Structures are given as C-alpha cells and as structure tokens.
UniProtKB/Swiss-Prot annotation:
This is L-arabinose isomerase. It catalyses: beta-L-arabinopyranose = L-ribulose. InterPro entries: Ara_Isoase_C, AraA_central, AraA_N, AraA_N_sf, Fuc/Ara_isomerase_C, Fucose_isomerase_N/cen_sf, Lara_isomerase. The gene is araA. GO terms for molecular function: L-arabinose isomerase activity; manganese ion binding. Keywords: Arabinose catabolism, Carbohydrate metabolism, Isomerase, Manganese, Metal-binding. Catalyzes the conversion of L-arabinose to L-ribulose. The keyword Metal-binding applies. Pathway: Carbohydrate degradation; L-arabinose degradation via L-ribulose; D-xylulose 5-phosphate from L-arabinose (bacterial route): step 1/3. Transmembrane segments: none annotated. Coiled coil: none annotated. Binds 1 Mn(2+) ion per subunit. Belongs to the arabinose isomerase family.
Length: 496
C-alpha cells in the first residue's frame, strides 16, 4: 500500500477560570485519560494528541495557529468539559484551516445519583457548554463535524475513526498529484473539467505527460524484475494454462508486468498517487494497461479511464478513506431489467480493482476491440456482496458536485463465461428506475468510484471539508423531492 505521513489528531478541551484551579486540573486529568484510552483502541487509525485545556482567547487562537502550521496534524477535535464562553473561540475559529470535529460528550457516562452535588454539576457542564460552543460555530458558518455520545461508546469511536480517515484523505487531497497519460477520450463531456479550479478547490495538481515518457520507463525495466513479478502473479492469481508456458499468452502477461513496473516507477519518481490512461493515446505501447492498472489500484493508486482525472483523484481519496479496502474505479455498463430483480452490471474495459473481488482473480488474455493494440492481459473475477456506495464527482462550471448512490452488491445468479472482464452486480437504492432518474438529473458521470468500505457519511464529511455540494441517492430518495433539492442547491451555491 502507498504509505501516508504519520498523521495525528489534536484533542483540545475548552473551559474557563471561573471554577478555580482544582476544577481545571480535573478537566485536564479527564482529557488525558480519554486520549490515553482512545490510543489503546485499534479502531482508531491515527493517534490522538492531547494539546491543552484552553481557557482564554489567546490560548485558543494559539493552538489553532499551531494546528495550521503542523504537517502532522490532520484535524482538531474539540470538547467543552465545562462551560467555555464561546466569544473566546471566535479568533481561533477564524484562523483554523484544519478539519474540525466537535465531540459532544462528557467524562462520566452516568449521573451519580447518590452523590451528585453542585461541585459535580459545575465540573460536568458539557450538556450546555457544548451548546454554547455549537452556537458560535453556527453563527460563524464554521464547517465542522458534530458527534454526540459517550466517549467510550463503540459507535461514537467508530464515527470518530471514519472521520479521521476522511480528514486524512482531505490532507492528502491538498498535495495530490495526478499524471495524465494522453488526453481525454475525444468528444466526451463529463471527463472534462477545470483543472485550475480543481487545484484551487481541492489542491490537486493535474498535468499531462506524453506516452513516450512512459514508454521509456517501460523499456528500462529489466527482465529480472519482470520475471520476479511473474512469479508474484502465479502466487496470487489463477493463470490460464496457456499463460503458464512460453507462447503469445505468456508474452502478453509479461508485457503487462513490464507496463506495471514502468508505470509504477514513473509515478514514484514524480510523487503521483493517481493517474489516467486512454485507449486513443497509446503510441509506442504494445497494449492498453489492464492488469498493470488493476494491481496499482490495489496498492492504493487512484485511476480513471479515458483521461478521467476527476475520478482518478476521487478513487485515490476514497482508497485513503477505506484504508485501501474494497474500493475501485467503476462504470455503470449495462442493465438487467427483469421485473422485481432490476440490476446494474458494473465493469470497465479492463480496469476494475481486485480489492472488490469475491473470487480468486484469474489472469486471462483476450482481444480488445478498441485501441488497435495487442491483446491485453487482465484480471477477471466476480465482485463481492454487500452494502456499498457509488460516487461521482462532476464539474458544473461554477462548482463541483459530488453525487453518491447507496447500492447493494449481489452475487450473480448466472455464470458469464464469455465476459472477459472483472465485473460486479448491484441493486441501486431506492430502485434502478428512481436511482438512475435522480443520477441523470444530477448530472452523474458514467465513471464512478465503487466502495464497500467508504460510507455516505464519510463522503458527506469530505464534501463539507472541501466546500463542495454533495447529493445522496438512497432508500429515502423520491425523484420529486430530489428535483427540488437540486433547485435549492443551485440557488444556495450560486449565492455563495
């Protein structure tokens, strides 16, 4: 997997001097206990760092500026243990540029019925201290996540952990580099977009490179490295019999190994974590990258076909949110309109990530009718089952829109022996008819990122961090209400 920098999350507790030094010592002690307990829980992907109990406007502003300056700090979690007058927070919140989570909790889970007194009441005031803090966030229009519940509750911890992954994806987004090999597929609209606007909005650096640059990297790959990678293929995948002996099929597989090694070297040298290819720009290459792309996605790279750089970047960020699990570039390919069992078959020409596979992938070689190159090797498999999301990022000219459809992947009821690509079947929520109608009304692309591991909540959180629109299609969606939502959003986003 692609490595991430050692991110951390800062925990900042709000209070004030009204209650005396002894109370502040208890607030700090409780905060340290919470952080220590969290850091022992493997559910959290990154460590918490307790920064301080802040009690003055100067302390609050200082810690916010320090968070901005720290490359390790991916987000700030705040909690008001006691009442913390929120005017003190204005200066700091005006400065803060890192993702913010407001944890509405309290140290004790239960009220100590027999011993509760006013000392206890004054110390444990988050029930109204956090409401005061919440007001100033609303008054200032601060983008923040609010999580409510006891800090030891597994559900609360799970929500915190998912937000942490999303915040790290946002941090990675600010430095994400996309390499485009060739241009977009000719005459296609949705894969186009404003690359300068994307860099301003998300931080993405998107640049094009000639196929000849990549071809040279491929040619520089040694036969020893190719042979070592072929051995790895044989350990991980089933390979068609013709691919296990010398001949054209094995040579096709060897070529994909060569492409994988050359492509990976190019990406590593340029610090790219996402890339695109297109079958219309392959001069000097023997095959369209297939198996090579699938394996690089499995390592955490983002990918988009036909020059789709927005989806390539989205795949990379969702890989980060998912910790590399169960996430792939995808395309809505064809429909099954059987009444009561409507399905979508998702696939692509070659490039579906094996992290969503339910079966052991099989390396096969088949002709590709477009691109005019040799028969490419690819991994063929059926996708898994379970709840998932499909997400699409589009450029509407004056803003970006993230569209999310919740789906349920299902096991194929029939074999598809003549279909030479990786594939997955799903039932979109609320139905194929309504989801497709809503998707089309929203302008959703035919390319998506499909994920078993990323949740709708994470994608909504990312949109909030990035300052973009997000619309969700799920079991509660009605097309008439969705149309109104799109109209209301148009007014809101044009007015910002």
């Amino acid at each position: 997997m692609l490595s991430l920098r050692p991110y951390e999350f800062w925990f900042v507790t709000g209070s004030q001097h009204l209650y005396g030094e002894e109370a502040l010592k208890q607030v700090e002690e409780h905060s340290r206990i919470m952080v220590n307990e969290w850091n022992r829980d493997s559910v959290f992907p990154f460590p918490f760092v307790f920064k301080s109990v802040v009690t003055t406007p100067e302390e609050i502003r200082r810690v916010c500026l320090e968070a901005n300056a720290s490359e390790q700090c991916a987000g700030v979690v705040t909690w008001m243990h006691t009442f913390s007058p929120a005017k003190m927070w204005i200066g700091g919140l005006l400065e803060l540029r890192k993702p913010l989570l407001h944890l509405h909790t309290q140290f004790n889970r239960d009220i100590p019925w027999d011993s509760i007194d006013m000392d206890f009441m004054n110390l444990n005031q988050s029930a109204h201290g956090d409401r005061e803090y919440g007001f100033i966030g609303a008054r200032m229009g601060v983008a923040r996540k609010v999580v409510v519940g006891h800090w030891e509750d597994p559900e609360v911890r799970e929500r915190l952990a998912k937000w942490m992954r999303t915040a790290v994806a946002f941090a990675e987004s600010r430095n994400l580099k996309v390499a485009r090999f060739g241009d977009n597929m000719r005459e296609v609209a949705v894969t186009e977009g404003d690359k300068v606007g994307a860099q301003i909005q998300f931080g993405w650096s998107v640049n094009g490179y000639g196929i000849g640059d990549l071809v040279q990297y491929i040619r520089d790959v040694s036969e020893q490295k190719v042979n070592e990678l072929l051995d790895e293929y044989e350990e991980l995948y089933d390979i068609v019999p013709a691919g296990r002996q010398e001949g054209p099929v094995r040579e096709s597989i060897r070529e994909q190994a060569r492409i994988e090694l050359g492509l990976k070297a190019f990406l590593q040298d340029g610090n790219f974590t996402a890339f695109t290819t297109t079958f219309e720009d392959l001069h000097g290459m023997k095959q369209l990258p297939g198996l090579a792309v699938q394996r690089l996605m499995a390592e955490g790279y983002g990918f988009g076909g036909e020059g789709d750089w927005k989806t390539a970047a989205l795949v990379r960020l969702m890989k980060v949110m998912a910790d590399g699990k169960g996430t792939s570039f995808m395309e809505d390919y064809t429909y099954h309109f059987e009444p009561g069992n409507e399905l979508i078959l998702g696939a692509h020409m070659l490039e579906v990530c094996p992290t969503i596979a339910a079966t052991r992938p099989r390396v096969e070689v088949h002709p590709l009718s477009i691109g005019g190159k040799e028969d490419p090797a690819r991994l063929v498999f059926d996708g898994g089952e379970g709840a998932a999301v499909n997400a699409s990022l589009i450029d509407l000219g004056h803003r970006f829109r993230l569209i999310v459809n919740e789906v349920d992947a299902v096991k194929p009821e029939h074999d598809m022996p003549k279909l030479p690509v990786a594939r997955i079947l799903w039932k979109p929520r609320p139905s194929l008819r309504d989801s497709a109608e809503a998707w089309i009304l929203a302008g959703g692309a035919h390319h998506t990122c499909f994920s078993f591991a990323v949740t709708t909540e994470q994608l909504q959180d990312f949109a909030e961090m990035a300052g973009i629109e997000c619309v969700v299609i799920n079991e509660h969606t009605s097309v008439s209400s969705f149309k109104n939502e799109l109209k209301w959003n148009e007014v809101f986003w044009r007015g910002r």
